[in-house]
Amino acid sequence: MNKVSGRSFTRTSTCLLATLIAGVMTSGVSAAELVNSKALESAPAAGWASQNGSTTGGAAATSDNIYVVTNISEFTSALSAGAVAKIIQITGTVDISGGTPYKDFADQKARSQINIPANTTVIGIGTDAKFINGSLIIDGTDGTNNVIIRNVYIQTPIDVEPHYEKGDGWNAEWDGMNITNGAHHVWVDHVTISDGSFTDDMYTTKDGETYVQHDGALDIKRGSDYVTISNSLFDQHDKTMLIGHSDTNSAQDKGKLHVTLFNNVFNRVTERAPRVRYGSIHSFNNVFNGDVKDPVYRYLYSFGIGTSGSVLSEGNSFTIANLSASKACKVVKKFNGSIFSDNGSVLNGSAADLSGCGFSAYTSAIPYVYAVQPMTTELAQSITDHAGSGKL
């Protein structure tokens, strides 16, 4: 692990950046600059992460708590600074398994779940920062809050020992990212989460049933709050985003789970974009692409409204192949919930009429200032062009 100072850095050329990174990785001495000055940015005002305080991550880090890391050993060492403000810059692929395959459920649980402490910014350098074979966990059990994750690719973990549930088949356990147990003030920006090199058509069968090895992409649950997800790409995944742990978890979740989603792309995701229990979700200017006849990631729905969950959808784009205008209500599914409103969204190039889908209007006030751009083909393409890792 190599520490770098807190002075800002203006990138003048690709060669200069490459030289700096090479020096950090090979010399074993402290470099002179902060490689990615965007690590000093706070969560945008247009989002729940800006409310009831702010989300600054590790922006206040002193020079001895700014790092460049290239592997899991360096990453966990940097995280060991605890709640002190820190900036952890990622270059290349971090294999959370350390190159040693997980033997079984217990081994995967022990080694694959990486807890990100309070006052931390994790940010990728350049275009190839990546996490594989594990999960980033933002767990509020010990008071964790004020975390920023930016410009990284997360390949969803593969459960090496799924559990079997009678009537439901094989179920996997691990998510790409999990915000849980009261964690609050979290900003996820320019992140890509995808099944990557192991897609669902590669599942085998066991005891006559599909051996499912993926769980969620990004889950937010158990009383977590004040989260903004922006400019991110969710690609090729089934159960994408669960907000709210269960129908019976009202004691922990009620009045929490305020989440904003904007300028994100949900591409070839089957469902849960998101599925909501108890949470209050604001989704605007996002792009949803799918196909109800996709042979691998068959589109089921985007918004799932569960127990006491509510969603305000504004200016979103739905391009769903083989879905007619008369079936527009397929984009929002009722799971014991009743509150959903949409304004200005587009389905397959025409205004989406979601007013007759059987929901009550979303009436809660949005406390922050935001601007919904009218959804056009050009805007949808621009959002797509700028979403995900490597686009910061």
From Swiss-Prot:
SMART domains found in the cross-reference section: Amb_all
Residue sites binding Ca(2+) per the record: 173, 175, 215, 219
Protein name as annotated: Pectate lyase A
Cofactor: Ca(2+)
Chain's gene name: pelA
Residue numbers annotated as active site: 272
PANTHER family: PECTATE LYASE 18-RELATED, PECTATE LYASE 21-RELATED
Physiological role: Involved in maceration and soft-rotting of plant tissue.
One GO CC annotation: extracellular region
Catalyses which reaction(s): Eliminative cleavage of (1->4)-alpha-D-galacturonan to give oligosaccharides with 4-deoxy-alpha-D-galact-4-enuronosyl groups at their non-reducing ends
Alphabetized UniProt keyword annotations: Calcium, Disulfide bond, Lyase, Metal-binding, Repeat, Secreted, Signal
GO-annotated molecular function: metal ion binding; pectate lyase activity
Lineage: Bacteria, Pseudomonadati, Pseudomonadota, Gammaproteobacteria, Enterobacterales
Disulfide bond positions: 329-357
